[in-house]
């Protein structure tokens, strides 16, 4: 009996080690070893309404209660903190409030909702040299016939490398919540 227990323990140990190696293999196969990989993109709000100066969210997020027929603009800054030139795409996308830690849920990709149809970002694409930043403007034009109520979105700054021969594409997005 003791021989079988020792053999079983040895086999179990080998199986555990093998499963750890196999479980990590797919991640290692997809690892990007490019030191200048996509990333290091930043975005921040540069201004907030005077009426919201005491609201701590107002300098981090676009926070406004806009009546129908109102148009606002907010200046933002997008930055490239990498060591190479990057093309950064700016666009709004849908979000919602739901269950979870903070409740703010972002839609897939360039998902559209009512608020995103009222939003624009100019410029939509910026080419930034290494370690530089550029301003952009977010405009929200609420139509006259818009329903009252809260709307949610995010303004994205995104970079993307071309897909590899295996179809893998690195995408980096950072955003500003819009309430």
Spans of features found by a protein language model:
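Short secondary-structure capping/turn segments at boundaries of alpha-helices and beta-strands
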Residues: 60-63, 73-77
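Secretory targeting and sorting signals
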Residues: 1-29
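Asparagine-centered strand-capping/turn motif at beta-strand->loop junctions
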Residues: 78-82
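Terminal connector regions
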Residues: 84-111, 135, 141-179
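Surface-exposed binding patches on compact interaction domains or structured appendages
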Residues: 31-61, 83-135
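Short Pro-Gly-centered flexible turn/kink motifs
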Residues: 69-75, 127-139
